[in-house]
Amino acid sequence: MASLRKTHPLIKIANDALVDLPAPSNISVWWNFGSLLGLCLITQILTGLFLAMHYTSDISTAFSSVAHICRDVNYGWLIRNIHANGASFFFICLYLHIARGLYYGSYLYKETWNIGVVLFLLVMMTAFVGYVLPWGQMSFWGATVITNLLSAVPYVGDMLVQWIWGGFSVDNATLTRFFAFHFLFPFIVAAVTILHLLFLHETGSNNPAGLNSDADKISFHPYFSYKDLLGFVVMLLGLTTLALFSPNLLGDPENFTPANPLVTPPHIKPEWYFLFAYAILRSIPNKLGGVLALLFSILVLMVVPVLHTSKQRGLTFRPATQFLFWTLVADMIILTWIGGMPVEHPYIIIGQIASILYFALFLILIPLAGWLENKALEWV
């Protein structure tokens, strides 16, 4: 008699994904981030749900309702701090997950990779509309500046901006719809995540060697279920430590001031996890050019599989491309730093050089290095 987990129509699906899934025996801790992202999403949905029970999406009460949550609601301060810092951990895991994919050539699973890029965009949109909700100064001005970028779209730009705003400026209609979007998007993210997994399980996981691992598989449970559990403990420990000891470390002090359309903050900048893209946007003096560069800074990930020139899958045995990969990591850190700096010398030129290098690495240098390594292998 086969066990219930192998016969029940619903439990069978979970079993094939979480229990009897054949996984490569050599996948390292870098393969933990997928499950960590799932944990982040669940944490954000749960804390967000409890916050939504007490939040009011009206410009006259939004800021006060957040203060009320932190002061008067049972453990409201904790729920809010976990939700706000959970977003940062979400993006840390996202960037590490993408970096793993780039390093080990996981992007060659094209459907899985492209759905992942769509997920990345969806999570970015969710985080952006969520940042507007507390209705502080940086919430308001961040929303104004970023939505205003759509006015760069030829012909329909201005109409598009007014359509998103629901008026002629960021106002009550904007806040209400952003709350609706912020509530909806995580569930769309959850649905697309299932698609992401569906396509991944068509091929099975990649591994650090970049070789076919069909001959050497082990079951997901207990080996990787416990390994994932360890990752959960480490991440939750980090998240609770940040949320309890320095919850405002990654936030902007401007957001402690209620939104005021008449006073512009000295430096308008998004949360730290968007700064690299913001730096690329600012480094182009033309509005439409900046918007296109911003968009392409994310969409460039979609062309990575097309530009794969190497005979080998990962970078494990490719020192030249390894060097360029770590150059890309350093470049991202520089862009993040520049995004938080004022627009003045020398930050402008550093940002422009870093932006050019960012695209050059993806589109020219890494594919070229792969081709050169192929040539070098022919001489061995």
UniProtKB/Swiss-Prot annotation:
Reported function = Component of the ubiquinol-cytochrome c reductase complex (complex III or cytochrome b-c1 complex) that is part of the mitochondrial respiratory chain. The b-c1 complex mediates electron transfer from ubiquinol to cytochrome c. Contributes to the generation of a proton gradient across the mitochondrial membrane that is then used for ATP synthesis.
The residues listed in the UniProt record as binding heme b b562, with positions renumbered to this chain, are H83, H182
| Further comment found in the protein's record | Heme 1 (or BL or b562) is low-potential and absorbs at about 562 nm, and heme 2 (or BH or b566) is high-potential and absorbs at about 566 nm.
Q: Where in the cell is it found?
A: Mitochondrion inner membrane
Subunit structure as annotated in this protein's UniProt entry: The cytochrome bc1 complex contains 3 respiratory subunits (MT-CYB, CYC1 and UQCRFS1), 2 core proteins (UQCRC1 and UQCRC2) and probably 6 low-molecular weight proteins.
Quote the cellular component terms of the Gene Ontology held in the record.
mitochondrial inner membrane; respiratory chain complex III
PANTHER family in alphabetical order = CYTOCHROME B
The Swiss-Prot or TrEMBL record describes its family as follows: Belongs to the cytochrome b family.
The signal peptide stretch is none
Q: What is this protein called?
A: Cytochrome b
Q: What does the entry's cofactor note say about binding and number?
A: Binds 2 heme b groups non-covalently.
Q: Which Pfam families match?
A: Cytochrom_B_C, Cytochrome_B
| Transmembrane regions | 33-53, 77-98, 113-133, 178-198, 226-246, 288-308, 320-340, 347-367
What membrane topology term does the record carry? Multi-pass membrane protein
Cofactors demanded by this protein = heme b
- Which residues does a ubiquinone bind? H201
GO BP term, pick one: mitochondrial electron transport, ubiquinol to cytochrome c
Which GO molecular function annotations are given, in alphabetical order?
Answer: metal ion binding; ubiquinol-cytochrome-c reductase activity
**Can you tell which superkingdom this protein's organism belongs to?**
Eukaryota
UniProt KW keywords:
Electron transport, Heme, Iron, Membrane, Metal-binding, Mitochondrion, Mitochondrion inner membrane, Respiratory chain, Transmembrane, Transmembrane helix, Transport, Ubiquinone
Q: Which residues bind heme b b566?
A: H97, H196
Q: InterPro entries recorded for this chain? A: Cyt_b/b6_C, Cyt_b/b6_C_sf, Cyt_b/b6_N, Cytb/b6-like_sf, Cytochrome_b, Cytochrome_b_C_euk/bac, Cytochrome_b_N_euk/bac, Di-haem_cyt_TM
Indicate where this protein is primarily found.
Answer: mitochondrion
